[in-house]
Curated annotation (Swiss-Prot):
Residues 98-114 have a biased composition (Acidic residues). Residues 600-953 are annotated as: Interaction with SAFB1. This is Scaffold attachment factor B2. The modification Phosphothreonine is found at T201. The modification N-acetylalanine is found at A2. Expressed at high levels in the CNS and at low levels in the liver. Expressed in a wide number of breast cancer cell lines. The modification Phosphoserine is found at S54, S109, S158, S207, S507, S513, S787, S832, S886. It is found in: Cytoplasm; Nucleus. The modification Omega-N-methylarginine is found at R897, R903.
Length: 953
């Protein structure tokens, strides 16, 4: 195996007593060594003993080379085991007397583990798919030291005279391979001693020794009896070991057989040849006891092997060869030289057996009719006594099979990195793990890996399934299922293989009849368990087919037929009343009945079940069809509902899209409308603002017009007022015009007086208005009154000349003073009345010049004739004349004039030719003059600008 746990290689208490000189050493070629020898050599060197024969041979060759020996010639020990076995038996007796209890426990744990070893070794060496064990881990000691098979032969020879020793030997022999050479007397003794443990009647001896039996066995050759029986012998081994309370050596022998069991699959049919010679020498009692004792250990192995079949393997042939080779192990070591001689033939037969692998697994062939017929005859003679012997063992084995079958778990979907230790750690959370292995297909290394785990109880296995099925391990989803037992496939392939070798194996001993019966009982139990686990419709169909095949008659009875792919089997059982074999197809409830009822009642009930099974099969088929129809109907209904839902969803989505588009359009329309309304509102607001602005402007315009109208009205009022005041003095003025005092000659004098200061053109009198003549005289009187003493200070008339600068009149026409004076006079008059009137026209200039002359003339006439009131009246009278004046001496000119400082005087503060004297600063009624002061003492400081004005009148 891949891992050998500590202690597996120890000899144990039984071997401790062996003398060192017991074994004799011989030299054999490496290619001649069997797997068991290879493993023994590897174990001596503390090397790994796992793998098939080629791997072991390669490993051993490498080790031998490292030791410096010839790898082709290797020295191995050929043990002479007579003393060894004797000591072992004595030791076994002593230990039995001590009655140690832990043997049962160890057997328990070893039981499942041994099953696993056997089954997985078969798995490992499958002919079809070459399943190989990647990794394994086991709880109990898995293998025992290699004991020579010679010792098993010598045991009986040396101890058959003593019944006590024979009893002890019989307790231990079942653990050893069942083939031993015994003489007739020894056989009788062993039969007698076997009655200590089993109810074997003396008749069995006679029936077994009948010559008829020998003929039958010769006919049968080796067909399908010895190998399955040996296989079952391993299954029956453990309960018997417990019953007899055999301690250390006994257990070690069982482990040794396990080692053989695991080793022999590689050797295949090579060992069948030597088995025939061994069988000729072996005793029937030994075979019976070995069968009884080995049976339960193999049963779980069958389950394991069937569990491996899902990987696509064909374990049947390999299992059969494993079982047969298990039995042959001792005889081969006993007669190694004879074994080697027929080995080529054996290999040929092995190849032939492999050729039939597919047939064995896939169909139920009618080939073994001959063997089954002879086997039936064989059974007639031996069945009655054997049944009595086997029943207690069957019950015990039934319990063990029931418990052991459910303990094996098949784990699929493992990661390639998963090791057996990982599986063991994982499954040990939910119970005790007896053993765990990881297998894969050796031919395709990248293939999927599978795990095989054996728990201590089926309850723990169930718990593991419930907790670990469909869980994740190393990134992969694992499936945990109970392992299914399909032993019948193995039997079928055994039969085919045995038929191929019938000629070579014809010298089989009489003990086969006993083996056949026990084998059948074991097969029935295995089939019951298997039926419980996999009663499927396909199995039922196959079973029906098998039954049709079986019905023709008792000659066509096969011991066990199985559909390799389905797992339904038939069993041949001896009917006591008729003395002939009866074929029955088992159902799930058979195990309980077998333990409580007699054999004939069992066969009757089985026949009834055969009849019932057709109806049941039909019902099952009908139910299956009905379920299928219902499933299809439900599926159709679900599909229809799903399509309806999808249609509705599509329609709903379409309507939603349509509605959404409509809402979007409406939203756009509303948005456009809102924008239009907004634009209209803004337009309205703009128009409103415009209207208000126009309204304001209109109002302002109206106010302005109103103000102008008021101004005009006020001016008209003022004019009317002045005109109303003026007519009171107009008669005086008019009269004065005609006055004799206004002669032309007077003007000559005035002109003469002011000729330097007032040069005038000839047309100076053209625009003279005689109507206004009187006002100048009043004004002149007013001025003359206050300014006569100081001419330079009081010549007011000289200060009104600024107006003429404004309207651009030529300065040469008049004197500067007269221009300034009259302009200033008009401006001052306007200022005093608070009205901004346009400056006086040009005509006012002549009036001003003429007025000066009038003033001077009248000043001489009337000194101080007028008072201040007359001056104010003069202002009002002159207003009308100045109203028509226009020009630049308007508001700005008016604003620059000074105000009146005292009584009647006019201050000139505007812009003049020379120095500026502000009019506001004058006091005491004097009129400030800009350029008059120097003119009085010098009346003519400058030459007259116009010479033609210099003439005097």
């Amino acid at each position: 195996m891949a891992e050998t746990l500590p202690g597996s290689g120890d000899s144990g208490p039984g071997t401790a007593s062996l003398g060192p000189g017991v074994a004799e050493t011989g030299t054999r070629r490496l290619s001649e060594l069997r797997v068991i020898d290879l493993r023994a050599e590897l174990k001596k060197r503390n090397l790994d003993t796992g793998g098939n024969k080629s791997v072991l041979m390669e490993r051993l060759k490498k080790a031998v080379k490292e030791e410096g020996q010839d790898p082709d010639e290797i020295g191995i020990e050929l043990e002479a085991t007579s003393k060894k076995s004797a000591k072992r038996c004595v030791k076994g007796l002593k230990m039995e007397e001590e009655g140690t209890e832990d043997n049962g426990l160890e057997d328990d744990s070893r039981d499942g583990q041994e099953d696993m070893e056997a089954s997985l070794e078969n798995l490992q060496n499958m002919g079809m798919m070459d399943m190989s064990v990647l990794d394994e881990t086991e709880v109990a000691n898995s293998s025992a030291p290699d004991f020579g098979e010679d010792g098993t032969d010598g045991l009986l020879d040396s101890f058959c005279d003593s019944k006590e020793y024979v009893a002890a030997q019989l307790r231990q022999l079942p653990a050893q391979p069942p083939e031993h050479a015994v003489d007739g007397e020894g056989f009788k003794n062993t039969l007698e001693t076997s009655s200590l443990n089993f109810k074997v009647t003396p008749d069995i001896e006679e029936s077994l020794l009948e010559p008829e039996n020998e003929k039958i066995l010769d006919i049968l050759g080796e067909t399908c009896k010895s190998e399955p029986v040996k296989e079952e012998s391993s299954e029956l081994e453990q309960p018997f070991a417990q019953d007899t309370s055999s301690v250390g050596p006994d257990r070690k022998l069982a482990e040794e057989e396990d080692l053989f069991d695991s080793a022999h699959p590689e050797e295949g049919d090579l060992d069948l040849a030597s088995e025939s010679t061994a069988h000729a020498q072996s005793s029937k009692a030994d075979s019976l006891l070995a069968v009884v004792k080995r049976e339960p250990a193999e049963q779980p192995g069958d389950g394991e092997r069937t569990d491996c079949e899902p990987v696509g393997l064909e374990p049947a042939v390999e299992q059969s060869s494993a079982a047969s080779e298990l039995a042959e192990a001792s005889s081969e070591e006993l007669a190694e030289a004879p074994t080697e001689a027929p080995s080529p033939e054996a290999r040929d037969s092995k190849e032939d057996g492999r050729k039939f692998d597919f047939d064995a697994c896939n169909e139920v062939p009618p080939a073994p009719k001959e063997s089954s017929t002879s086997e039936g005859a064989d059974q007639k003679m031996s069945s009655f006594k054997e049944e009595k012997d086997i029943k207690p063992i069957i019950k015990d084995e039934k319990g063990r099979v029931g418990s052991g079958s459910g303990r094996n778990l098949w784990v699929s979907g493992l990661s390639s990195t998963t090791r057996a230790t990982d599986l063991k750690n994982l499954f040990s959370k939910y119970g005790k793990v007896v053993g765990a292995k990881v297998v894969t297909n050796a031919r395709s290394p990248g293939a999927r890996c599978y795990g095989f785990v054996t728990m201590s109880t089926s309850d723990e296995a169930t718990k593991c399934i419930s907790h670990l099925h469909r869980t994740e391990l190393h990134g992969r989803m694992i499936s945990v299922e109970k392992a299914k037992n399909e032993p019948a496939g193995k039997k079928l392939s055994d039969r085919k293989e045995c038929e191929v070798k019938k000629e070579k194996l014809s010298s089989v001993d009489r003990h086969h009849s006993v083996e056949i019966k026990i084998e059948k009982t074991v097969i029935k139990k295995e089939e019951k368990i298997e039926k419980k686990e996999e009663k499927k419709p396909e199995d039922i169909k196959k079973e029906e087919k098998d039954q049709d095949e079986l019905k023709p008659g008792p000659t066509n009875r096969s011991r066990v037929t199985k559909s390799g792919s389905r797992g339904m089997e038939r069993t041949v059982v001896m009917d006591k009343s008729k003395g002939e074999p009866v074929i029955s197809v088992k159902t799930t409830s058979r195990s309980k009945e077998r333990s409580s009822k007699s054999q004939d009642r069992k066969s009757e009930s089985k026949e009834k079940r055969d009849i019932l099974s057709f109806d049941k099969i039909k019902e099952q088929r009908e139910r299956e069809r009905q379920r299928q129809r219902e499933r299809e109907i439900r599926e159709t209904e679900r599909r229809r509902e799903r399509e309806q839902r999808e249609r509705e969803q599509r329609l709903e989505a379409f309507h939603e899209r349509k509605e959404k588009a409509r809402l979007q359009r409406e939203r756009l329309q509303l948005e456009c409308q809102r924008q239009r309304l907004e634009r209209e509102r803004m337009e309205r607001e703009r128009l409103e603002r415009e209207r208000m602005r126009v309204e304001r402007e209109r109002r302002k315009e109206q106010e302005r017009i109103h103000r102008e109208r008021e101004e005009l009205r006020r001016q008209q009022e003022q004019l009317r007022y002045e005109q109303e005041r003026r007519p009171g003095r107009r008669p005086y003025d008019l009269d004065r015009r005609d006055d004799a005092y206004w002669p032309e000659g007077k003007r000559v004098a005035m002109e003469d007086r002011y000729r330097a200061d007032f040069p005038r053109p000839d047309h100076r009198f053209h625009d003279f208005d005689h109507r206004d003549r009187g006002q100048y005289q009043d004004h002149a009187i007013d001025r003359r009154e206050g300014s006569r003493p100081m001419m330079g200070d009081h010549r007011d008339g000289q200060h009104y000349g600024d107006d003429r600068h404004g309207h651009g009149g030529p300065p040469e026409r008049h004197g500067r003073d007269s221009r300034d004076g009259w302009g200033g006079y008009g401006s001052d008059k306007r200022l005093s009345e608070g009205r901004g009137l346009p400056p006086p026209p040009r005509g006012g200039r002549d009036w001003g010049e003429h007025n000066q002359r009038l003033e001077e003339h009248q000043a001489r006439a009337w000194q101080g004739a007028m008072d201040a009131g007359a001056a104010s009246r003069e202002h009002a009278r002159w207003q009308g004349g100045e109203r028509g004046l226009s020009g630049p001496s308007g508001p700005g000119h008016m604003a620059s004039r000074g105000g009146v400082a005292g009584r009647g005087g006019f201050a000139q503060g505007g812009h003049s030719q020379g120095h500026v004297v502000p009019g506001g600063g004058l006091e005491g009624g004097g009129v400030a003059s800009q350029d008059r002061g120097s003119r009085v003492p010098h009346p003519h400081p400058h030459p007259p600008p116009y010479p033609h004005f210099t003439r005097r009148y």
